[in-house]
């Protein structure tokens, strides 16, 4: 969710830069340098575990209280445990 919000804000920022550059009549936009500095937003977020229904290969890929279901495709499902 956090990543999708950041990507949406980045896309809106790029659209704003492009429209403002067109309004100024500028042939040289400085947006490519700005986009390179924002590259980290577009990289996938590394997680320490997979959430419910996330893809997995083994139980340790899934978050706490989840286990890897071996049905094809493999996914993380609740392992019927509770607690903190």
From Swiss-Prot:
Disulfide bonding pattern of the chain: 49-63, 56-68, 62-76
Highest taxon in the source lineage: Eukaryota
Region forming the signal peptide: 1-21
UniProt entry tagged with the keyword Cytoplasm: no
Protein name: U21-theraphotoxin-Cg1a 1
Organ and tissue specificity: Expressed by the venom gland.
Cellular component terms per the entry's GO annotation: extracellular region
An MF annotation (GO) of this entry: ion channel inhibitor activity
Predominant cellular place of this UniProt entry's protein: secreted
Localisation: Secreted
